[in-house]
């Protein structure tokens, strides 16, 4: 990502603040989701609905719809990304239901490594020693976190929440790879189309009775995940991208999981054991290694950049 030389220091400072705020908000979504008292499908449905309405209003109010360059290929690819994105959210929130936010978020951040692995398969991208090392380190870290051993059954694995976090990471990786081919539509439009698709495809799975017993506090958390964690945060995120260097973004994205882990340990009292702690460190060390390969490069997708992980 090349910075415009005409960017002023004030613009850059403002962009840094926006990016930091967006990463902090992204990092708090696990904490918010645990206080919604909604299952994953219903929570993602509300998130998609609120985000679609909010981003649609901003898109129309700003007049940006007048400058969009529509193409059938981009729209179809955006919708395909939207399918994977929506179920990425479903699986992520499902993992929050079954395990701690710390464990779920750590495993979820396998996504950049999975992009490397899948990219080598689908796009014939060569893996160097650093890439292979990062993949091995991350998967060993995942094994330590999940406590997998010779006696671990499929039922135990499914009930641990780890499998849902892995599926969320896998679907995010597919979202990233598909998003590389979207060139003409703006990030606001792609996100609007994807969340709108989410509303449509999730309706058959929604149990509306789940909303009947929500308290006022639950509703505040529910609406926040849609408007703040999806709508407002994307405005902050995308508005700051073009003013910041790839190197800075590569570093600041670690603020997202850091906030999630701090909130989980402070407010829920979760304490990972020695092996889980080692696994968490290994996953983020492996993720950091992937940045060595991609330093100086950034491809903006419907959800962010290929060097970055957001919820």
UniProtKB/Swiss-Prot annotation:
<keyword id="KW-1003">Cell membrane</keyword>
<feature type="transmembrane region" description="Helical">
    <location>
        <begin position="103"/>
        <end position="123"/>
    </location>
</feature>
<feature type="transmembrane region" description="Helical">
    <location>
        <begin position="248"/>
        <end position="268"/>
    </location>
</feature>
<feature type="transmembrane region" description="Helical">
    <location>
        <begin position="128"/>
        <end position="148"/>
    </location>
</feature>
<feature type="transmembrane region" description="Helical">
    <location>
        <begin position="192"/>
        <end position="212"/>
    </location>
</feature>
<dbReference type="GO" id="GO:0016020">
    <property type="term" value="C:membrane"/>
</dbReference>
<keyword id="KW-1133">Transmembrane helix</keyword>
<protein>
    <recommendedName>
        <fullName>Uncharacterized transporter YxxF</fullName>
    </recommendedName>
</protein>
<feature type="transmembrane region" description="Helical">
    <location>
        <begin position="157"/>
        <end position="177"/>
    </location>
</feature>
<feature type="transmembrane region" description="Helical">
    <location>
        <begin position="218"/>
        <end position="238"/>
    </location>
</feature>
<feature type="transmembrane region" description="Helical">
    <location>
        <begin position="272"/>
        <end position="292"/>
    </location>
</feature>
<comment type="similarity">
    <text>Belongs to the EamA transporter family.</text>
</comment>
<keyword id="KW-0812">Transmembrane</keyword>
<keyword id="KW-0677">Repeat</keyword>
<feature type="transmembrane region" description="Helical">
    <location>
        <begin position="76"/>
        <end position="96"/>
    </location>
</feature>
<dbReference type="InterPro" id="IPR000620">
    <property type="entry name" value="EamA_dom"/>
</dbReference>
<feature type="domain" description="EamA 2">
    <location>
        <begin position="166"/>
        <end position="292"/>
    </location>
</feature>
<dbReference type="Pfam" id="PF00892">
    <property type="entry name" value="EamA"/>
</dbReference>
<dbReference type="GO" id="GO:0005886">
    <property type="term" value="C:plasma membrane"/>
</dbReference>
<keyword id="KW-0813">Transport</keyword>
<feature type="transmembrane region" description="Helical">
    <location>
        <begin position="41"/>
        <end position="61"/>
    </location>
</feature>
<feature type="transmembrane region" description="Helical">
    <location>
        <begin position="13"/>
        <end position="33"/>
    </location>
</feature>
<feature type="domain" description="EamA 1">
    <location>
        <begin position="24"/>
        <end position="147"/>
    </location>
</feature>
<keyword id="KW-0472">Membrane</keyword>
């Amino acid at each position: 990502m090349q910075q415009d030389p005409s960017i002023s220091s004030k613009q850059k400072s403002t962009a840094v603040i926006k990016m930091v705020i967006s990463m902090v908000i992204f990092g708090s979504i696990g904490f918010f989701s645990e206080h919604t008292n909604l299952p994953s499908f219903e929570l993602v449905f509300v998130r998609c609905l609120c985000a679609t309405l909010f981003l649609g209003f901003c898109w129309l109010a700003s007049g940006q719809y007048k400058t969009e360059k529509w193409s059938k290929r981009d729209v179809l690819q955006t919708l395909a990304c939207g399918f994977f994105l929506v179920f990425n959210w479903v699986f992520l929130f499902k993992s929050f239901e079954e395990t701690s936010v710390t464990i779920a978020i750590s495993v979820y951040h396998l996504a950049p490594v999975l992009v490397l692995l899948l990219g080598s398969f689908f796009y014939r991208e060569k893996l160097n020693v650093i890439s292979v090392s990062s993949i091995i380190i991350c998967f060993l870290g995942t094994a330590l976190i999940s406590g997998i051993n010779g006696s671990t059954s499929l039922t135990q694995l499914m009930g641990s929440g780890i499998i849902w976090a892995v599926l969320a990471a896998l679907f995010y990786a597919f979202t990233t790879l598909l998003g590389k081919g979207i060139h003409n539509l703006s990030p606001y439009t792609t996100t609007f189309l994807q969340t709108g698709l989410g509303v449509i495809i999730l309706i058959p799975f929604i149990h509306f009775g789940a909303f009947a017993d929500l308290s006022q506090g639950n509703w505040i958390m529910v609406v926040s995940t849609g408007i703040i964690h999806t709508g407002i945060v994307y405005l902050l995120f995308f508005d700051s991208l073009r003013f910041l260097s790839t190197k800075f973004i590569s570093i600041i994205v670690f603020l997202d999981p850091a906030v999630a882990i701090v909130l989980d340990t402070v407010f829920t009292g979760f304490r990972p054991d020695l092996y889980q702690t080692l696994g968490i460190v290994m996953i983020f060390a492996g993720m950091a290694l992937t940045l060595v390969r991609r330093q100086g490069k950034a491809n903006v997708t419907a959800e962010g950049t290929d060097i970055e992980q957001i919820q």
